[in-house]
């Protein structure tokens, strides 16, 4: 005879409703952490070079899958990742009256299939590695979650159901308004502090402007190629204007609104057409031949200012936005690791650096966040080709760094928001994960608020106007105010996308906490609950 698990006494279905919530949260977390950034490359050569169904990456040697290296810490995290999934799934299976052994078998099978599906999809994500070891460790994690449910699942569900009833009783409109005012007040202050770390407040005023090398003057970092023009702005350039500027061809015309502009025509010293920055003259071994259509760099010489560009640093600290455009042509792309542009001193980290690394372009600029624990360079692949001109523009609005090349904006952006600042306090952040940190940060801020609003929503099922006011004041207004606060800090532009993200996260929290509830009926009070 099959024994059904004992449900929560106060609400016969309330306890096991949490199995749905835990399972939804686990699946969402697993998909985000394993498939981010959700950019799939279904290249034909991958399918011919390896078998994705057997999780074999190209380069398989002696029966071993190349590129997948894991240690004990990775295995532990893979197990831990699937524990909530196994816990929630076991609750759903046991609610249907299945035996503990049946629940264990079903959880292991579902965990293995889910993990395999993820590993299969990771095969088509360039920054991810697939491997059977992840399937094994994830399946073990699902089993551990199932065993945890067998041991303490009902007690956990009863505890969560009791907490839910207490919060629901507390979540009157008045109490919710007071809590949210205090809650968002704290988050606004924390977010403003974190956002300030993306400003250009720590730029050195005594740095030199160098083209073709860095201020250290090391021959190993000297660049080979040709530069036609260089421009600076102390503001971000709108996307349409940036596309227009970089699609003009080489050498492109100088923009009349630029703060500083060099066209490298004629003979050195090259003057700034706006007379804002000092002239650039040759350093190292002065080249014997010159080109009237651009400055030629042979790896032994480079251009540098004799005086620091202190006014540029002061302007960037004040705004604090910038844009830089350079039109250049590399001589070669094999075995190259050289500086094309640098605002730097003879020693120490530069203010800004743009370098060629084979065919890749690497960009870095100084701010309090990028100076902590990791260099946070942005590497953009396959930008250069030998003896082909590239019109390049970077634009930074105080939070997002955008890249334009030859009239096209690259899809990915380098996003420095409060999420990156919070992540830096916890771990060594990675440039490829910057956008993901923002999603996590907005979830941390707005999902809990959405849960509280979801409790309040239950109390007004027959009040359309009251619900409308709740949506405007509870879901929409905090997200708008949050973006305004970060804008008022003075280091980022207002983003409608971020406002929408905050609203979406709040709605997700409200929907999640109401999983299994019939919101058309009023919430029963404790006095109306079934007797024990």
Predicted regions: what they are:
Residues 365-391:
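Short, aromatic/His-centered strand-loop micro-motif at the edge of beta-sheets
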Residues 58-87, 132-140, 433-449, 497-504:
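Membrane-interface loop-to-helix entry segments
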Residues 112-143, 195-199, 476-510:
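Interfacial helix-loop-helix junctions of multi-pass membrane proteins
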Residues 170-231, 235-319, 344-348, 356, ...:
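Extracytoplasmic low-complexity segments
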Residues 339-367:
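Glycan-recognition/cleft segments
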Residues 1-16, 93-103, 153-172, 459-468, ...:
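Membrane-interfacial, low-structure loops and terminal tails that flank and connect transmembrane helices
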Residues 35-76, 409, 413-434:
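Extracytosolic (periplasmic/ER-lumenal) interhelical loops and adjacent juxtamembrane/interface segments
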Residues 324-326, 387-397, 401-403:
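Short tryptophan-centered beta-strand motifs in secreted/extracellular beta-sheet-rich domains
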């Amino acid at each position: 005879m099959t024994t059904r698990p004992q449900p929560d006494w106060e609400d016969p279905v309330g306890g096991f409703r949490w199995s749905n919530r835990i399972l939804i949260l686990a699946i969402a977390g697993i998909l985000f952490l394993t498939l981010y950034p959700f950019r799939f490359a279904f290249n034909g050569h991958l399918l011919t070079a390896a078998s994705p169904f057997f999780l074999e990456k190209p380069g398989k040697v002696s029966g071993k899958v190349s590129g997948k290296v894991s240690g004990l810490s990775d295995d532990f995290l893979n197990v831990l990742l699937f524990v909530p999934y196994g816990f929630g799934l076991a609750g759903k299976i046991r609610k249907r009256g299945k035996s503990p052994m049946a629940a264990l078998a079903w959880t292991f099978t579902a965990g293995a299939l889910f993990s395999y599906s993820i590993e299969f999809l990771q095969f088509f994500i360039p920054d991810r590695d697939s491997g059977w070891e992840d399937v094994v460790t994830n399946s073990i994690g699902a089993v551990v979650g199932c065993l945890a449910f067998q041991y303490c699942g009902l007690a956990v569900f009863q505890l969560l159901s009791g907490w839910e009833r207490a919060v629901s009783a507390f979540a009157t409109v008045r109490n919710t308004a007071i809590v949210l005012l205090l809650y968002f007040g704290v988050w606004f202050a924390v977010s403003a502090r974190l956002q300030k770390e993306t400003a250009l407040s720590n730029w050195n005023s005594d740095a030199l402007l160098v083209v073709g090398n860095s201020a250290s003057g090391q021959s190993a970092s000297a660049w080979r190629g040709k530069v036609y023009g260089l421009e600076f702005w102390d503001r971000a350039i709108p996307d349409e204007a940036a596309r227009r500027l970089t699609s003009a061809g080489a050498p492109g015309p100088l923009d009349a609104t630029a703060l500083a502009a060099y066209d490298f025509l004629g003979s050195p010293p090259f003057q700034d057409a706006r007379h804002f920055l000092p002239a650039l003259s040759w350093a190292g071994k002065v080249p014997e031949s010159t080109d009237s259509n651009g400055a030629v760099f042979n790896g032994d010489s480079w251009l540098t200012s004799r005086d620091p560009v202190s006014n540029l640093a002061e302007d960037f600290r004040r705004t604090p936005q910038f844009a830089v455009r350079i039109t250049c042509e590399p001589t070669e792309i094999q075995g190259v690791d050289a500086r094309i542009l640098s605002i730097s001193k003879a020693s120490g980290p530069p203010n800004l650096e743009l370098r060629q690394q084979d065919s890749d372009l690497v960009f870095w600029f100084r701010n309090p966040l990028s100076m902590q624990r990791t260099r946070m360079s942005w590497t953009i692949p396959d930008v250069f080709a030998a003896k082909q001109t590239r019109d390049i523009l970077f634009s930074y609005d105080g939070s997002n760094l955008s890249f334009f090349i030859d009239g096209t904006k690259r899809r990915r952006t380098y996003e420095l928001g409060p999420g990156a600042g919070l992540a830096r306090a916890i771990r060594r952040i990675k440039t490829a994960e910057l956008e993901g940190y923002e999603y996590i940060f907005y979830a941390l801020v707005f999902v809990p608020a959405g849960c509280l609003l979801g409790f309040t929503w239950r109390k007004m099922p027959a009040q359309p106007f009251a619900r409308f006011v709740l949506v405007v004041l509870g879901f929409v207004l905090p997200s708008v105010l949050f973006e305004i606060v970060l804008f008022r800090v003075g280091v980022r532009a207002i983003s409608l996308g971020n406002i929408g993200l905050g609203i979406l996260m709040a709605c997700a929290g409200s929907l999640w906490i109401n999983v299994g509830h019939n919101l058309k009926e009023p919430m029963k009070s404790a006095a109306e609950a079934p007797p024990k």
